Amino acid sequence: MNITIHRGANQIGGCITEISSDNCKLLIDFGSNLPGNQKAELTEKQICDIAGSADAVFYTHYHGDHVGLHHLIPASIKQYIGAGAKDIMLCKYDALNQHGDYGKEIEMV
């Protein structure tokens, strides 16, 4: 078993951790950087390199630095979050939808 911390060890936020074996790759969180963070956001290629072969993504909670890039995970990869956290995310996106369409981003989780 291998554990790789892609982001979050040397910064606050933007957490992405990989747990893998010969036949399985799981990601824990896929967060965006916190505002004001001096680290560059991931490129599309970096996101594909990290998430492309994952079997699933599990989110620890609904804060943006843990789920902020969930909408960039390929649709073929299953994503999981607790029911309470999902309800909070849906409430947030429902409120935001009054000013734009954010629904497609949350449907994947």
What are these regions (language model features)?
Residues H61-L69:
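Hydrophobic alpha-helical bundles that form the membrane domains of multi-pass transporters
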Residues G103-V109:
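Short, intrinsically disordered, charge-balanced linker/junction segments flanking boundaries
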Residues G68-S76:
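Metal-dependent catalytic neighborhoods of phosphoester/phosphodiester hydrolases
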Residues R7-A9:
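Short Gly/Pro-enriched turn/cap motifs at secondary-structure boundaries
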Residues Q11-G14, E18-Y59, H71-L72, I81-G103:
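Pre-active-site segment of Zn-dependent metallo-hydrolases
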Residues M1-N2, K25:
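Extreme N-terminal starter segment of soluble prokaryotic enzymes
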